[in-house]
Every structure is written in structure tokens, then in C-alpha cells.
């Protein structure tokens, strides 16, 4: 059990130094903050998927995946002739 506490202590120290120690926990100032941020981001994505449906959520991800620092996903899709069906983005009633 002590090794688990020691590992958490090391991770907490790294988090306080600005290192990301939990996937999705970027921006937290401690290990606990990293864990809470990661959990909230995951839960937010799941909620959005439920609201939009699997198809809409996937389509939104396709568009987001096309974005770059220079242009949005929508701009790039239009320029390259990639069809993005934004009607799928609507939340379910």
C-alpha cells in the first residue's frame, strides 16, 4: 500500500510542476485536479454523444479532425470538397 501512496505523491509533485500526469487532465495543479478534470471531460463527451446520437457525434468529430491552426474544419472541408452533413449535429428531441 505504501508504494501506491508513494507513486501518487510522485505524480502529484509532477502535476504541481506543470506536467500532465493523467490523460485528459491537462491544466490541473495537482494529481486530484488532473483526475477530476479528466473525469469531467470524459463525462461531458459521453453526455454530448447521448444528446446528438452516435451518428451526429461522429460527424462532428470528422469535421473537428479536419481543423488546423490555419483554418477551421468547415473551411478545409469546403476547400477540399469533403461533405460534412451538419444536419446530424442537431440534438435529439
Swiss-Prot record:
Q: Where is the composition biased (Basic and acidic residues)?
A: 9-19, 31-52, 73-93
UniProt entry keywords in alphabetical sequence = Stress response
Task: Name the PROSITE patterns for this protein.
Answer: SMALL_HYDR_PLANT_SEED
Q: Where is this region: Disordered?
A: 1-93
InterPro entries membership: LEA_5, Sm_Hydphi_plant_seed_CS, Small_hydrophilic_seed_prot
- Keyword field contains Flavoprotein: no
Source organism superkingdom: Eukaryota
Q: What is its induction?
A: By abscisic acid (ABA) and osmotic stress.
Which GO biological process categories is it annotated with?
response to abscisic acid
**Pfam families, alphabetized:** LEA_5
The record's family statement is: Belongs to the small hydrophilic plant seed protein family.
Q: What job does the chain carry out?
A: It is thought to provide protection for the cytoplasm during the desiccation stage of embryo development.
The record's annotation in PANTHER family points to: EM PROTEIN, EM-LIKE PROTEIN GEA1
Any further remarks?
A: Wheat contains at least 10 different genes for Em protein.
Q: What is this protein called?
A: Em protein H2
Amino acid at each position: 500500500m505504501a508504494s501506491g501512496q508513494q507513486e501518487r505523491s510522485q505524480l502529484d509533485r509532477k502535476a504541481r510542476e506543470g506536467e500532465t500526469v493523467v490523460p485528459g487532465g491537462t491544466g490541473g495543479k495537482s494529481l486530484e485536479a488532473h483526475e477530476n478534470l479528466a473525469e469531467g471531460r470524459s463525462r461531458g463527451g459521453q453526455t454530448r454523444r447521448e444528446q446528438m446520437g452516435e451518428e451526429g457525434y461522429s460527424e462532428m468529430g470528422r469535421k473537428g479532425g479536419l481543423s488546423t491552426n490555419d483554418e477551421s474544419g468547415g473551411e478545409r472541408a469546403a476547400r477540399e470538397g469533403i461533405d460534412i452533413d451538419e444536419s446530424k449535429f442537431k440534438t435529439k428531441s
